[in-house]
Design a protein with these regions (language model features):
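Core RecA-like ATPase module of SF1/SF2 helicases and allied nucleic-acid translocases
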Residues: 1-119, 124-141
Length: 141
């Protein structure tokens, strides 16, 4: 408990859904909504109508595009695995560099939405993701 209201918190994820290799689709926003409903925590869904002046009556659940111009005291950024370009292969380097930089810019945009607290959750580490390696190195310098 850090003295935050629910409206001070955003849970952000790259995309609302992800298609798995086995063909199934995970609806990440639905999973978050269900988890918060189960423990009676109020939330709002980030959309085009959400502005910095809007009254936030609960935790904001949003993909990264809808919080672009907003600020929260606390941001939880999860499911970085949904970003496609975790590493750059030497063979596919030309087109992957632009995509990699685009994903890095998305991460930068999200982490700058937090004014006091930032939590990043991921199953990746510095060895499995260049994006995570860059984040860890920037924190440690």
């Amino acid at each position: 408990n850090k003295g935050l209201d629910y409206g001070d918190i955003a849970i952000v994820f790259p995309y609302n859904k992800k298609k798995l290799k086995n063909g199934k689709t995970i609806y990440f926003q639905y999973l978050l909504r269900k988890a918060l409903d189960d423990v009676n925590i109020p939330y709002i869904i980030g959309d085009d109508d959400l502005t910095k002046h809007a009254k936030k009556t609960g935790i904001t659940l949003s993909n990264l595009y809808f919080i672009k111009n907003l600020e929260y005291k606390a941001v939880v950024f999860c499911e970085l695995e949904m970003l496609y370009n975790q590493t750059i292969n030497k063979e596919d380097q030309d087109y992957q560099i632009n995509d990699f930089i685009g994903d890095l810019n998305k991460i930068y945009m999200v982490i700058n939405r937090a004014s006091e607290y930032l939590t990043i959750t991921t199953t990746f580490n510095e060895n499995s993701s260049e994006l995570i390696k860059i984040l860890v190195n920037s924190i440690n310098t």
